Amino acid sequence: MQILCHLSQLIEKSAEVYGEKIALSYRDYDREQWMGISWNLFARRVDQSARSLVALGIGVQDNVAVFSQNKPESLFVEFGSFRNRAVIVPFYATTAGAQVQYMVNDANIRVIFVGEQQQYDTTWSVMSLCHSLEHIVIFDPKVKRHPSDNISMSFDEFLRLGINEPRYQAEVQRRVNDAQGTDIANILYTSGTTGQSKGVILLHSQYNHALEAHTKILKITPDDVVINFLPFSHVFEGAWAKLCLSCGAQLAINLRPLDIQRSMREVQPTCMSAVPRFWEKVYQGVLEKMESGSAIQRNLIKDALKVGAEMWEKYTSKGKQAPLGLRLKYAAYDKTLLRVLRKTLGLTRPNIFPVAGATISPEVERFVHAAGFPMVAGYGLTETCATVSFDHPDKPVSLGSIGRPLPGVEVKIAGEDNEILV
């Protein structure tokens, strides 16, 4: 069941349905284990964040920056901001100081949330040049602050600002009640063809349409475990995360990109969005593994992938039934060699694997499907709240295609350059 509502109410309404079910999980690097956050706790942290933002003087449609790696706190702040009708402006965790300075001043940001030492140091280095910036809130308690820093606070200190203040809670509820689809949800800075980055405005109504339209095609359920690999600051991952949360799925938040393969084996996700480069590395790793094996092993794996590719490209992707001999051969490989391959990657329960952001080569796309990963290739823009088109699992799919338009989206190919108009 998908919960469709203004994003200011999504986590609250989801907690009413799912309660103590795990909504978010993350690796605790001190304990070396994955920790869970229930929907109830998620909703409490969102509400605490909303009240504390009021305490800091954040008003309706004020801009709040999040400069961090993927963390649960990023989502607490984002949805807490939505409850205030405030706007989240996410920065990539690797953003340089000059760009941070530009975006803070351009968006008139008063509060910035930083993830770890690198983001804190970068922000502090340009603090004197950011004339609107009043507060730095630090997610990681291990961050060492500058000796002269008297404006930053830890995330725990931030959360305590709104405790036992009924007036803050009343103000948050008033803003939730007044929330409109025309409210700005995000400003996403993207590199322009010339000059400084441009801030793309996304409205709550755009998200609401996108979330509803996707679930007409994709089947995401509360049983899904979705690992977050791409940064939330990217429209692809940010919109995908909101879609999965609206369907009650669990988000397994991967902090460090280099840990992704380890995280996949530990979490055993059913879904993950990625760029083609991720699958290219997986494919290259399989090829290298094949070359290090015996001739018999190489030939068996090659044949398994060949059979899997034929099964998908000629039959499954076209909605056709394969000949009995091919079906039996594929079933044998699927239960043995291909199953081992999926287990090695930590993807034994595959459901949906969206891929976008660049062109994926036919060779890699063929491999992904041959191995049994239901990849959904697509195309999108920041301005369109990510998706323009993607492969519809219930419709015929062609190798190299970027699928069919999202319901409600109109596309036109125009001019001598075959420009895509949306």
Question: In which residue ranges do the predicted regions lie?
Answer:
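Conserved AMP-binding/adenylate-forming core of the ANL superfamily
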Residues: 24-79, 96-101, 154-159, 204-205
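Conserved AMP-binding A3 loop
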Residues: 36-40, 177, 185-211
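Conserved AMP-binding/adenylation subdomain of ANL enzymes
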Residues: 208-225, 232-335, 349
